[in-house]
Amino acid sequence: MNTNIKTREYTTISEVSGPLMVVEGVEGVGYNEIVDIETPNGEKRSGQVLEVTDDVAVIQVFEGTTDLNTKNTKARFTGQTAKIGVSRDMMGRMFNGIGKPIDGGPEIIPDEELDINGSPMNPASREFPEEFIQTGISTIDGMNTLVRGQKLPIFSGSGLPHNELAAQIARQAKVLGDDAEFAVIFAAMGITHEEANFFMRDFERTGALEKVTVFMNLADDPAIERILTPKMALTTAEYFAFTLGMQVLVILTDMTNYCEALREISAARDEVPGRRGYPGYMYTDLANIYERAGRIDGKEGSITQMPILVMPQDDITHPIPDLTGYITEGQIVLSRELNRKGIYPPVDVLPSLSRLMSGGIGGDKTRDDHSGVSDQLYSAYAGGRELRDLVAVVGEEALTERDQKFLEFAEEFEGKFITQSKDEDRSIIETLDLGWDLLKILPKSELKRVKEEFIEQYLPKE
């Protein structure tokens, strides 16, 4: 064995498998410790300790194990956990999944070095989320409102325009009536080069890059880097929010790729699989990410999360959306049926939900009629959708005049309220006024979920 007490350097590599490397005869090694690795040809790589049993350490290699062998590879344990250097200068910059600049700009001179695992928020010090965030998307702002400090995921399907929606939210999101600086941190995991180019071009074209910090992990990057990307992004968000006092929106896409990387590494470690082959600790791992959203009593800033995940086979009961739903505070569901009709964004409001919406709307936050309008739109659209199924059986001629109105409302709701262009940024007032304009289609006697005073004040006169 070739070891050095000071540097703890080892050449006792016993196995190299997938993204993992096993080192024997180690002493004083800790979980999550960072390891400097030197390949036989002198190349420098980094890794992290996944597991320590007696004198054996299992290391995940960030850059992959290609060209590593058991004879001429060196591993040096640093005694440090993974950290990222953070600074205000990260605004408007692009980094890879492990925090290295990829935009051709200079290296970041950090104000602080922070552990990427963060520190848990004391539940007693959390403030309840209750400030409205305007995304400019009517189906979100009007009916599934995003609130500052909330975690609200978007459930999508393969081929649906979640990337376009994510880019639009990153461009348009803002906190109304708040002088605090607003920042967006965009973390992409396992995306293709085509998708990466789309996001880069979109942010640059619209000028949104000034307020966006991007962490980009590509599909051909190592899976272990994918595990670090959301932690890098959230650590930066915590610095912006709780040190610099910014209002931060974190968009994480695609959490399905993150979970696939978890499964790949778990399989390489020969762990006992859980549901559908995913590791049993996936719930805990996802909770560690999602629970880093929130507000802290006495701190100006906040972290709001919008994780995006693609449901395999559009299955909302799949372990990834299923576990995400347990941890987060609602969901925005994209519909393949609406997408086939050419509707963008194809948000299906009926299965969508924002559990914290009630605390962030009404009065001086949005408008006093917001809750009633939202409830009435839900009710009327649900009625119209039910009648569509009936029409398929009995035909439209069998419907009453009242039913015809609800059917017309459903069509107009999809064509005018849900549908908007990819560059259209609707204010909450425009969204609510549009809702009232559509409710005018229905007989006034059917508007049972809004107060009479609001009907008199806001319903357009014939």
UniProtKB/Swiss-Prot annotation:
Keywords linked to the UniProt accession: ATP synthesis, Cell membrane, Hydrogen ion transport, Ion transport, Membrane, Transport
GO biological process, one term: proton motive force-driven plasma membrane ATP synthesis
SUPFAM superfamilies listed in its UniProt record: C-terminal domain of alpha and beta subunits of F1 ATP synthase, N-terminal domain of alpha and beta subunits of F1 ATP synthase, P-loop containing nucleoside triphosphate hydrolases
The keyword Transport appears for this protein: yes
Primary location class: membrane
Location(s) in or outside the cell: Cell membrane
Entries under InterPro entries matching the protein: ATP-synt_VA_C, ATPase_a/bsu_AS, ATPase_F1/V1/A1_a/bsu_N, ATPase_F1/V1/A1_a/bsu_N_sf, ATPase_F1/V1/A1_a/bsu_nucl-bd, P-loop_NTPase, V-ATPase_su_B/beta
Membrane topology classification: Peripheral membrane protein
Keyword Cell membrane (UniProt): yes
Any GO MF annotation of the entry: ATP binding
Subunit composition and interactions: Has multiple subunits with at least A(3), B(3), C, D, E, F, H, I and proteolipid K(x).
HAMAP family registered for this protein in UniProt: ATP_synth_B_arch
Assigned protein family: Belongs to the ATPase alpha/beta chains family.
Role summary: Component of the A-type ATP synthase that produces ATP from ADP in the presence of a proton gradient across the membrane. The B chain is a regulatory subunit.
Name this polypeptide is given: A-type ATP synthase subunit B
Species: Methanobrevibacter smithii (strain ATCC 35061 / DSM 861 / OCM 144 / PS)
